[in-house]
Each structure stands twice: as C-alpha cells, then as structure tokens.
A protein has these predicted regions:
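Bacterial N-terminal signal peptides that target proteins for export
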Residues: 1-12
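Bacterial N-terminal signal peptides
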Residues: 10-22
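Intrinsic-disorder/low-complexity accessory segments
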Residues: 26-211, 251, 257, 263, ...
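Mobile, glycine- and charge-enriched loop segments
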Residues: 212-264
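Short, solvent-exposed turn/loop segments enriched in Gly/Ser/Thr/Pro and often Arg
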Residues: 217-220, 230, 285-292, 798
C-alpha cells in the first residue's frame, strides 16, 4: 500500500520519534548525557565556552562544560584559548601538534600518518577509544575484514554472527575538505579531548564499544592558505580581504567531487584509510546553511546502485540525530532538505559505494573566526515539514556556536551508534554479502573490456581508476562466449552508421558475443562491485523527476567518458570463464617491438602522446597526415614517426606512455609533417581557478610542461608569440565573460595574493592586487599572439569570451531555449575527421556537457540573417501549400534556390549577398567545425530535455584568426579526471599547433 505523501512524511516523523533514544529508553533525556559528578570541571575553560556562545540555546549539556584533567592538555595548550574562540584559526600543523600532545598524554589516543597532499603536507588519522580496544585493534580489524569480504568465511551467516558479537565498529570523521569552512578542526580537537578524558557514562560507553577515527583536516594545503587569508584580515581591520583563490594545489570546491575519478591525493588517502580500518561510517563535516543540516537523509533521487539497507541506515541515523538535538533545545537542526543523493562523486560517498554508511553535516559558519551578525533569507528561516524548528532570521553567530553544534551532533550520533553497534556491524556484513551476490540477484554478472583495437592508454587509465577504487580486475586466459538479452535499441551509434529500421512488431534477438583472451573482466561477485557498477553503467535522470534542481552531475558513465568500449554482461556464465586476477591493472606497460632507427606509434586517440613528445624532446618526431600500413600493422592519421633517439630513452618513454612502438625498416610512404616541441602557457584569471585546476592536474600527471601565467601577465606582455606556441585558457566557471577583461570592481583596497612573512602559504601564483583583469591591452596582446600564428584553446565560458571579443570570426553561441540539462554525457559526431584535432578517433565520441552549450557558424563575421529553405514560408497566391505562386502576365523566371545548410554548417551566400560584402570571411579563414552533437541517440547518460534545441549543433570549432587559430570547445574536454576520452582533442591540437590552417570543410 502506497501512503499519500503527507502520510508518509508523518510516518517518518513518528519513526524518528520512536528511534530517537532507544539506547537510553531507561533514562529520561536529562540524565542520558549526564556528567560524572565525581569528575572535576575545568572552570576557566568552561567559563570561556559560555562567554563565546552567543545564546544559551546555541549550546547543549554535552558541550557547555569541559572536564578537567591533570595529565591531558586541553586545546587551549596549543590554541592559547578554547576551541571556537574568536580570532583564532590554527594551521594544520598546530592541529596536529595538539593531537600528538593528546596521544603522548593518554593511551586512549593514537595518531597515524595517512599520506600527504600534492604540496607535501601531512594528512593524519587519530584513533580514540579505551586503551583495551586500541590494543585489540589488529585482531578486531581482522574480524572486520572477514565481515567486509564474506568470501573469506564462505558466506556463512552463522560465522558472521559470531564475528559481529566479538567485534566493535569504527566510525570515521573527516573535517575541512572545503577550506573556507573553518570550524571543524577546533571542534574535533575539543571532541577528541572529551572522548579521551570525560567520564560521563555515555562517553565511557562510546570509548568502550567503538573506535572513533578522525582526520581533522582533509584539504591540508587549503587549510593553511585559509589561515593565511584570515591572518591578513586580522592585520588589516576594516579592509576587504582576498578571497581564497587556491584551496588545494589544483582544485577548490571540486575536491569534494573526486570520489569517482580518484585524481587527488586527499581522496585516495581517505579511501585507503577508510578501507584499511574497515570502518562502517564516513562522516564528512562541512559548513554552509544555518544552523545544522544533517543531509544524511537527503532528498531523491537516491543513487541507483547502493544497497537498500543503506537507505534505511540514512533514515535511521539522520532522523535520530535531528530528534536528539531537537530535544536538547537547539534550534535550526534538520535533515532531508533538497540535497539529492544521486551522484557518487562526494568524498562521503566513498563509504556508500564500499558497503559503508555515508554521512555529512552542514553547520553554520562565518568563513573564519569572527563573531558576526548574520541576516538570513526567507528560504533559510521559514518553517517547513522537515524544518519544524527553523533557524532564527537574525542571529549573532560565533565560531564557538559552530563548535557547539558540531560537537553536540557528533556526540549524540556516535553515542547512538555505539549503543546499536551490533546492528551496524550486521548490516555491514549483509551489504558486503549482497554485493558479492549481485550477479545472481539483480545483476549484472560482469563488465568486460574487450582486448580489441582501442586506445591502450585510455583503457589503462580506466583500469587504474578502478584499481584505486579497490575493485578486483581479472583478465581472460581463454576466449569466453556470453549471451546478453536483447535491448530495445542498439547503443548510441554514429550518425554515419548504415542502419535499417526494424518493423514495429519485430522482436530483437538476444546477442551472443565471444571475447578474446586478454579481455579485462570486472566481476560483480566481489565486495566492491557497487562502485564498479555505478561507474561502468549508464545513468538516466527523467525530465519529469520530482527533483527539478539536480545538485551535481546527472550522468558520468565512465566507458563513454573514457571512450573505452565496455560490455555489460548479464550472462552469469562469464564468471566460469578462465581468467586470472590482475594485481596492478593500468600500470605502465608500453613496449617497443623490434629494433631499429625508425619507430612508429599508432594514434588510437591516446592521451599520452603529447607527454611522450616532451620525454623525447631531442628526437626527430613527425606526424602522419594520412593512415598507412607498415610492419604488418595499420597506423591511423596522426600516428608518430620517431627517429634519432636512443633505445633506452625510447623504451622508458614508451613504457610510461602505455603505448606500443613498432620498429620500421624504413620511413613509411606517407605525407608527414614535423612535430616541434610546443611551448605551452596555461593562463588563468584572478576570478576563480576551480575548473582550470583540472586541466593543470591532467597536464602534470601526463608529464606535459607549461608556464603558468595569468591575465595580468598577459596585459603587460606585448610579445607573447616569441615565448609561446599555445595558450590554454580553461573554463573559469565564475562571472560573465566580460569580467575576464574587467576583473573585479576596483573599489576599496588592493587584494594581494603574495607569499610574505604574514602569508607564507599564498603560493602557486602571485599578484599585489587580484582585482585587475585582462584589460584591453591584454586582449590586444592575445589577438596579436593568435594573429602571429599562435594557438589559443578555449572552453565553455572562455570560448564565449573569445567569440564575444572577436577572436573567433564566424562563430556564435547557439541561443537555445527550453534545454534542461545538468552535467550529462552526450553523443557527438565528427564533421571534419581530416582535422589534426580529430586524429585517432572514429566517427563518434561521447562528451561531457554541463548545460548544453553549443555553437553556430556563419561565413560572415556578424550573424546576419541568411534566409534558408527551412525559414521560407510561401506567400498567399495560387496553388496548394507545396506549389509555387506564379504571377500573371509575364514569363516564368525561376528564383535562386534557397540554401539548406545542416545545423552544423554555415548558410552559403549567393552572389548578391557576397558582392562588396566587407563582413564576408575569405574561405581559408572560415571556421572549421570538427565535432557536433549527434542527431539521434543524443543522450547517453544523465538528464536531457529539449534535445532538439542542440541536436547537430557544433561543439568543437577551429576558428581562424590571422595566421593562427582559436580552438573553441562548447564542452569541457578536461573535467574532474573523468573525461579521458576527450583529452586527445586538446592534445592533438597542441601537437599540431602549426598545422591547423587548412580550408574549412564544405
């Protein structure tokens, strides 16, 4: 029976009230969290807590005091004041110093190094429990490992039940992944002290029944930069202070979107820690909305690949947590909200996709340690069914308030977790077991990556990501034949495919396929099948889904985005095929076949050829202008011919590039052009560096060197062409394109981003004032760079900037209406496969599109209206709708036929329109469309409504300006480490920067 919506909500609230305090059913709320009356209180510290808390109901009995200890230091030992005190933000090093003081003072605390950031800063995990539990940690971990992989106990529920009774859980808490969200480190410092020292019955129960594991600072590089910014702010009262331009070395807010691609150190360090401790929960602490939003419950749609038990755990923990804090009298605490739980890209979701429980708090914060008057908007303070006790509309908020809320929420929830630990461990086991049983229950049985002609480097990258996700990978040692049920229609095809329409009543037949030896198999009968399934499957978000505002990307299918053909197999016989486990799939394995002075490397859309060119910078490298056959192999257009290089240097470079080099007895009989080593600059603005950071990390990981410059540099550098061949201008993601020129408003004081004694961590780039933009001088310098033969590569908003400022003659932004798309994977078709940019590709490609941006092109520099056959509507006159009107009393003169261009083509001008037309672009300078959206099967994964507005429109265009080129991407080809399949579009262009000026395709 399906209850009405209001009834279901009421039922949820009833359930919440029932589960709020089952562990303390014997005790009224007033005693559930009572102190030990025999334990002394640190009166000075407690007085400061009261002083810095701006209203009594912004605290609770759990955090309105601090127990005293003669041997264990409080956070004040390092901070000089209590946690949450005004004007104090500790560096990560100081946070670590305190935790190590704790570990040195009590056997209930241990500190571990779990890795380092890209800039070499340490990340730690702190384990807190009774000394006896920590002493048993290895034995307990061995038991948890068996629950995590029930194959080790033969899937025996009885054995598992015994292990559950003997074991205690691990609850992993992470703080400050988002650097401007500053409160978690001090809250966790004080909470760790409480867990180690407090003798309140509920604390003692927590200590004796579970390990609390804490990583107080996840984004260590960004934390130290944020503290620098705050120190600058304190040293310059009354002045505007710089915004935090760089968080981590590469990305800012998107560091919490890396749980799929596993690109950043912090993601790998947290996942490895979570799995090596066999933790049951990963609870990530954030700051934004008032006063505390426990988005554990979240909103629909829920991720389609998680175990249903997790949905129940989210509901139980989230509603319980809110219920307890409501009963403690703290306003503005709620769950549900509008955060959909669809994307697995968030850090916390590492747990959800590895059989654990993902949780997240958003606590109100001020972006520093100031105490501020905060004025809320109606959407923040108005009451709704899931927010019956909303935040106050006007509030004086302090960092101490933040710490009170965060600690109270954590302490109540881990208390509930400890009291019900056997339930969570049992669920942990059953979720792991069902992951292994996936093939026989809901399927699929496996995913297979055939060992057929495809890009070795892209395939290796996909396998590497799966390996980082701790997914087991096997490889067929013999052929394997499977039969998959028929689909309603074939997977997305190129528009050039020759397909015949089926009769409406024709029944599609099951498909049988044989995979050759060497094919990779990702079995679904393994503990972490869910993350593999979520990444390798496709996603569909219905346009009429009740959730109208997706929180993040709606599609991410990795086989499409990596351009690695992968088959979803439901036939369980694949699991009986002969295969061997692969220990380090994706590791460098390129090799040179044969020996000789000339070698060829096929370009199958490899992502590593540009880096290979730099590794062999002294070699003679040429690029094939056409396909050729040599040494029994076929080589595509864009393949490399390498000469004058030592065998050792070649072998090392080829291995690292994960490609196969073939020795030739002579140079191939094919047209070649030289491949000079490009001089690259990566240009950023001082508006935002979030999205361009993904480009930098891709270049760095693929060993492509570049100079890192900014728009202010360009405004002062008149001769860019003497220094660079290519300038990359990645998406900005903030502000209108006009802000690239204008910069930030010049009101007030300068906003420096500089390394100084006061701000030693403000590095990566430098400026005395972040406000000035590119300016008109900088724009002219960019134009001069391109007109003198340089290549400017742009994407999304920087492509719109190039169009608006006249750098892309004949290219315009497609004005679409009614398109509903949020981070989806779309099909695309190559228009000019002869362009060097398209080298190594076939007819089609899957691309990531953030919002459906596309282009149109014209043969004129202004988008003048050229009437086409599609636009024509016949006038009133003789004949029917399809007939021509024939005036009376004269001979018939046939009109000039109206053009009928395709959506990706420019409308041709007739003689009348071309005569003495100063705006007509000469043919050799007309834009060249390389890639367009598909005309059918456009949506591959995610959400798309209004496809007709963007179908067949250009998305990658080579615009010609003077002697140079501006390459425009409507999509983002280098995004979150996920769009590996479109990387070569950028890299091909760079390698062929001086070979792009060819006539536009007709």
């Amino acid at each position: 029976m399906r209850l009405p919506v209001k009834s279901r909500y009421a039922l949820l609230l009833v359930i919440a009230s029932c589960i709020a305090f089952p562990a303390f059913a014997q005790n009224p709320l007033s005693t559930a969290y009572s102190r030990d009356p025999q334990q002394p209180v640190d009166q000075d510290y407690t007085a400061k807590i009261k002083q810095y808390t701006t209203a009594p109901n912004f605290n609770s009995p759990l955090t309105d005091y601090l127990p005293a200890s003669k041997t264990v230091p409080t956070p004040a030992k390092v901070l000089g004041d209590v946690s949450g005190a005004p004007n104090i933000l500790p560096y990560a090093e100081d946070v670590y110093k305190y935790f190590r003081l704790l570990a040195a003072s009590t056997p209930r605390v241990k500190v571990f190094t779990i890795g380092h950031s890209e800039e070499g800063r340490e990340m730690i995990a702190v384990a807190i429990a009774d000394e006896s539990l920590l002493a048993q940690q290895k034995e307990n971990d061995a038991r948890l490992a068996k629950l995590a992989d029930p194959r080790t106990i033969h899937m025996d529920d009885t054995v598992a039940a015994g292990l559950v009774k003997q074991s205690f859980p691990v609850y992993y808490i992470t703080g400050t992944i988002h650097s401007p969200e500053t409160g978690a480190p001090t809250a966790l410092m004080e909470m760790a002290y409480r867990l180690a020292v407090d003798d309140s019955p509920y604390i003692k129960y927590i200590r004796s029944h579970m390990i609390v594991l804490i990583t107080p600072v996840v984004e260590v590089d960004g934390r130290d930069r944020m503290v620098d910014i705050y120190k600058w702010h304190l040293a310059h009262p009354g002045e505007n202070y710089p915004h935090l331009l760089y968080w981590g070395h590469y990305v800012a807010h998107d560091n919490n979107r890396d749980a799929m691609g596993m690109t950043l150190n912090l993601t790998n360090n947290v996942l490895d820690t979570y799995l090596s401790w066999h933790a049951q929960v990963l609870h990530d602490l954030h700051e934004s909305v008032p006063f505390l939003y426990d988005n554990t419950v979240g909103d629909g749609p829920y991720n389609a690949w998680v175990d249903p038990t997790l949905n129940d755990e989210w509901a139980e923990l989230g509603w319980n947590n809110v219920g307890q804090m409501q009963n403690l009298g703290m306003p503005g605490v709620y769950t549900h909200g509008d955060f959909d739980t669809w994307s697995p890209g968030y850090l916390m979701f590492l747990a959800a996709m590895h059989n654990g429980i993902s949780r997240l708090y958003e606590t109100f914060g001020n972006g520093g340690a100031d105490t501020e008057k905060r004025i809320l908007g109606p959407d923040e303070y108005e009451r709704t069914w899931y927010k019956p006790n909303p935040p106050l509309p006007v509030v004086t908020w302090s960092q101490r308030n933040n710490n009170n809320y965060e600690q109270t929420a954590l302490l109540t929830t881990i208390s509930y977790f400890a009291q019900n630990s056997q339930t969570w461990l049992q669920n942990y086991y059953f979720k792991s077991k069902r992951s292994i049983e996936k093939p026989s229950e809901n399927g699929p049985a496996a995913y297979v990556i055939p060992d057929e002609n495809q890009s070795a480097s892209r395939r290796a990258e996909l396998l590497r990501v799966l390996t980082l996700q701790h997914v087991e990978i096997s490889r067929l040692s013999e052929p394997a034949t499977v039969t998959n049920p028929a689909k309603k229609s074939d997977d997305a095809k190129s528009d050039k495919s020759d397909t015949k329409s089926e009769k409406p009543d024709a029944k599609p037949e099951p498909k049988t396929r044989t995979f050759p030896p060497g094919s990779y198999v990702i079995r679904m009968d393994q503990p972490y099948s869910r993350i593999a399934d979520a990444l390798l499957d496709r996603q569909y978000w219905a346009p009429d889904d009740p959730q109208k505002h997706p929180y993040d990307d709606t599609g991410w299918s990795f086989p499409d985005l990596f351009s690695v053909p992968t088959v979803r197999v439901t036939d369980v016989s694949i699991l009986k095929a002969k295969m061997d486990p692969v220990a380090n799939a994706g590791a460098p394995s390129g090799s040179v076949n044969g020996s000789g002075d000339i070698v060829a490397i096929n370009n199958a859309g490899e992502i590593t050829l540009l880096g290979l060119r730099y590794a062999l910078k002294d070699a003679k490298v040429s690029i094939a202008d056409a396909p050729f056959d040599a040494a029994g192999k076929h080589f595509a257009t864009g393949s490399l011919i390498i000469q004058r290089v030592s065998a050792d240097a070649l072998a090392a470079a080829v291995k690292d590039a994960n490609v196969q080099a073939v020795s030739l007895t002579a140079a191939p009989d094919v047209a070649l052009h030289a491949a000079p080593v490009p001089r690259i600059a990566m240009m950023h603005t001082w508006l935002d560096t979030q999205t361009e950071g993904w480009w930098r990390v891709a270049l760095d990981k693929l060993h492509v060197p570049y100079d890192y410059i900014n728009t202010q540099t360009v405004s002062h550098e008149a001769d860019l062409r003497s220094k660079y061949d290519v300038i990359l201008f990645a998406p900005i993601g903030r502000g209108a394109p006009s802000m690239i020129i204008d910069g930030l408003p010049m009101y007030g004081n300068p906003l420096p981003w500089q390394k100084t004694d006061l701000t030693p961590n403000l590095t990566i780039d430098s400026t005395p004032d972040m406000r000035p933009g590119l300016g008109l001088d900088g724009l002219q310098h960019l134009k001069d760079f391109v007109s003198q033969g340089g290549l400017l590569i742009t994407s999304e908003d920087t492509a719109q900037f190039a169009i608006a400022e006249g750098l892309a003659p004949g290219v315009f932004v497609n004005r679409a209406t009614g398109v509903n798309l949020t981070g989806s994977v779309l099909g695309a078709t190559f228009v000019n496969s002869k362009s060097p940019v398209a080298a190594g590709y076939g007819d089609s490609l899957a691309v990531y599109s953030a919002n459906g941006l596309a282009f149109t092109i014209a043969n004129t520099i202004s988008p003048g209206r050229i009437q086409t056959e599609k636009d024509y509507h016949r006038p009133t006159g003789r004949g029917g709708p399809q007939d021509e009107d024939i005036p009376e009393g004269r001979n018939i003169v046939a009109p000039e036929p109206l053009p009928s261009p395709k959506p990706w083509e420019a409308a041709p001008l007739n003689e009348e329109q071309s005569r003495d037309n100063l705006f007509l672009i000469p043919e050799q300078y007309r834009p060249d469309v390389i890639l367009r959206f598909a005309s059918k099967n456009l949506l591959l994964s995610g959400l798309l409504e209004g496809a007709g507005q963007i179908e067949e429109k250009p998305i990658v265009v080579d615009a010609h300006y003077g002697q140079g080129n501006v390459l425009l991407f409507a999509n983002n080809p280098i995004y979150r480490g996920e769009t590996i399949g479109s990387y070569p579009l950028v890299f091909n262009a760079i390698m062929n920067f001086d070979h792009l000026n060819r006539p536009a395709t007709k």
